[in-house]
From Swiss-Prot:
CC annotations in GO: host cell cytoplasm; membrane; viral envelope; virion membrane
Protein's UniProt name: Probable FAD-linked sulfhydryl oxidase OPG072
Enzyme class, UniProt record, top EC level: oxidoreductase
Gene Ontology molecular function, alphabetical: thiol oxidase activity
Lineage: Viruses, Varidnaviria, Bamfordvirae, Nucleocytoviricota, Pokkesviricetes
Length: 95
C-alpha cells in the first residue's frame, strides 16, 4: 500500500505517542507502542526499513526519550518525499 495514503497519519500518531511519553514519563510503554506501530505498517518495505533502522540505532534499548524522539525526526526527514516537509531540527525543543 502506498505511503502517500497513510503516511502522514502514521507519523502524526508516532509523534503523539512520543509527546505523551514526554508528559507521563513512561518510556517503556512509548517504545512498545512505537514498535507496534512500526511493525504493523501496511507497506512491507516501509515496515522492514523502519524496523531495521530501529534495531541499527538501538532505539528499543534506549532510556533517553529525546534520543528516541530525535531518531524518529531524523527517520521522518530521511523519508520525506519533499524537502519542504522536513522538520527543522534546530527549531525542535527536547521533550
Amino acid at each position: 500500500m502506498n505511503p502517500k495514503h497513510w503516511g502522514r497519519a502514521v507519523w502524526t500518531i508516532i509523534f503523539i505517542v512520543l509527546s505523551q511519553a514526554g508528559l507521563d514519563g513512561n518510556i517503556e510503554a512509548c517504545k512498545r507502542k512505537l514498535y507496534t506501530i512500526v511493525s504493523t505498517l501496511p507497506c512491507p518495505a516501509c515496515r522492514r526499513h523502519a524496523t531495521i533502522a530501529i534495531e541499527d540505532n538501538n532505539v528499543m534499548s534506549s532510556d533517553d526519550l529525546n534520543y528516541i524522539y530525535y531518531f524518529f525526526i531524523r527517520l521522518f526527514n530521511n523519508l520525506a518525499s519533499d524537502p519542504k516537509y522536513a522538520i527543522d531540527v534546530s527549531k525542535v525543543k527536547p521533550l
